[in-house]
Amino acid sequence: MHPLQVCDPGGSQWCIDLSSDALIEIDHVTFGYDSSRTILNDLNLRFMRGQVTSVLGNSGCGKTTLLRLIGGVHAANKGRVVFDGEVIDVHNREQLYRLRRRLGMLFQFGALFTDLSVYDNVAFPLREMTDLPEPLIHDIVLMKLNAVGLRGAAQLKIAEVSGGMARRIALARAIALDPELIMYDEPFAGLDLISMGVAAKLIRTLNDVTGATSLVISHDVPECMAISDWVVLMATGGRIVAQGTPAELMASTDPEVRQFVRGEPDGPVKFHYPAATIEEDLGVAR
């Protein structure tokens, strides 16, 4: 055993490398929602501290499932998810509560409370998870809204804001507790070009200013390539096609990588879901 490794005292074959600068480690993780379909198969990934890492891939390849495993929503069928050297145990509620205070989540559709004001949406985690006095919460909320350019919208209702503004409000809420890890699930979905540019700039700026680690799940190649330190390309079944810097992936000659980053319709990734021939399904096969 390496002197900077901690291994399972029970004698199984896993070890955690304490010399690693990874905040999150996905260690031989296999997961499926039922026994008939495996979403992630023996997945190994490391998300480095202080970096923006984007995970790109086609729909259904397991990107959002990966976030759920990191957040302790689901337990891996095999393998381990490690957060800052600590193996996540979904059955340990005290641990989950403690670890979740250290992460922020921007959901794909915002998940804002429509009956609350912008201010109260951002204040919600501070009121629920801390004992801070209301005057201090007031100042924190205004600072977080100012960081996303919406301090002036604090008293608006959610029904009064645009989709792009709602995404920024959700981001302000996600960073309310100053998380070490910020996870973004499709942060650019449904945004116009200007709002998309604003969202991308915010992700990069907040990461650099706060020193957080950011994990971005997305289909949007140009935005992710512009803001990421590291990019992971996944395929169906949780298979890692490639990973590297944005420049390395853009220069790749691998046909599957080229097809995805260039949005080419023809290539190794097929349009049709596996099926019998159309002639067989229509009963006209010869």
Residue ranges and their predicted role:
Residues 56-58:
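The feature captures the beta-strand-to-loop junction immediately N-terminal to the Walker
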Residues 71:
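Helix-to-loop junction immediately C-terminal to a conserved catalytic motif
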Residues 87, 134-153:
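Conserved ABC ATPase "signature" region
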Residues 88-104, 134, 249-252:
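ABC ATPase NBD coupling module
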Residues 157-161, 165:
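Conserved ABC ATPase signature
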Residues 178:
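Conserved catalytic motifs of ABC-family nucleotide-binding domains
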Residues 182-185:
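Catalytic Walker B motif of ABC-type/P-loop ATPase nucleotide-binding domains
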